[in-house]
């Protein structure tokens, strides 16, 4: 089986490349300069291209990555399946406190450029009228080897290592997490074998900031403080019944990986 990964140098894409290769399948990972020049069948496309950490300062790159390249690939290339990697952030939009730009269709919720671009990408997939196009909304991903400090868990472990954690969200905040091993398996099978066009991807592991911080304090003897006026974000459990039924998916429980991950990332 042949796969093509766009965004193969990113956190998810790079891991996915190694995983699929280890399964014995062919993986084509075009360089950015070749994104718009492919004229062959790309097999099973997994679209991991995206901007996450500094998107507020990279508006043009964000739209280019989440929408413009997607438009080109759906319109101009041939493929056996196409899986657009979106975000579970869209399941939990934040309540708006500002009233500057407040489109009525979005009700009382914030409409930041990240969510807007992902929604545009999803809408394009749905209305492309192309066969076998899927959308996968992925929750917060945990890679026990990721010391980039560019996501919440990696960053907070780096802070613990230095001796002091400064929280930008409350201890009561809870989010959905998935181990990257589980994610890689699901992204490999959804394109070729998925029967639906939309999937929520999670693992029934909801973890609070409090649980993470308490473990890090025990592991590193660090201190922690919360910034003023921090917000509490409580995500509800993501419905993953479709991926459990279709792919015999049995998610790895946090009891297996959470503490080991915190130990490794805080070294």
List the predicted regions and their residue ranges:
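Active-site helix of classical SDR
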Residues: 113, 117-120
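C-terminal substrate-binding subdomain of Rossmann-fold SDR/epimerase-dehydratase oxidoreductases
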Residues: 168-267
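NAD(P)H-binding glycine-rich loop region in Rossmannoid oxidoreductase-like domains
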Residues: 35-76, 89-90
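NAD(P)-dependent short-chain dehydrogenase/reductase
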Residues: 123-175, 180
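N-terminal Rossmann NAD(P)H-binding glycine-rich loop of SDR-like oxidoreductase domains
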Residues: 1-23
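SDR active-site strand-loop-helix element
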Residues: 6, 45-49, 82-88, 136-138
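A short beta-strand-loop structural module common to alpha/beta enzyme folds
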Residues: 26-36
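Conserved Rossmann-fold NAD(P)-dependent oxidoreductase catalytic core, especially the SDR/UDP-sugar
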Residues: 71-113
């Amino acid at each position: 089986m042949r796969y093509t990964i766009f965004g193969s140098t990113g956190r998810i894409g790079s891991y996915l490349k190694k995983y699929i290769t280890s399964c014995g399948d062919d993986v084509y990972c075009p360089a950015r300069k070749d994104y718009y020049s492919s004229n062959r069948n790309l097999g099973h496309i997994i679209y991991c291209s995206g901007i996450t950490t500094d998107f507020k300062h990279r508006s043009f790159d964000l739209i280019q990555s989440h929408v413009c390249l997607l438009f080109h690939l759906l319109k101009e290339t041939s493929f056996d399946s196409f899986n657009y990697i979106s975000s579970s952030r869209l399941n939990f939009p934040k309540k708006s406190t500002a009233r500057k730009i407040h489109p009525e269709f979005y009700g009382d919720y914030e409409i930041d450029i990240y969510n807007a671009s992902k929604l545009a990408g999803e809408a394009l997939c749905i209305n492309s009228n192309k066969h076998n196009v899927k959308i996968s909304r992925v929750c917060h991903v945990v890679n026990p080897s990721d010391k980039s400090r560019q996501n919440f868990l990696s960053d907070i472990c780096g802070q613990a290592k230095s001796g002091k954690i400064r929280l930008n969200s409350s201890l009561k905040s809870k989010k959905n997490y998935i181990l990257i091993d589980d994610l890689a398996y699901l992204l490999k099978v959804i394109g070729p074998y998925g029967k639906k066009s939309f999937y929520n991807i999670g693992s029934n592991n909801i973890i609070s900031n409090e649980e993470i911080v308490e473990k890090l304090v025990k592991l590193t003897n660090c201190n922690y403080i919360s910034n003023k006026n921090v917000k509490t974000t409580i995500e509800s459990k993501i419905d993953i019944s479709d991926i459990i039924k279709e792919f015999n998916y049995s998610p790895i429980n946090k009891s297996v990986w959470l503490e080991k991950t915190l130990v490794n990332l805080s070294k």
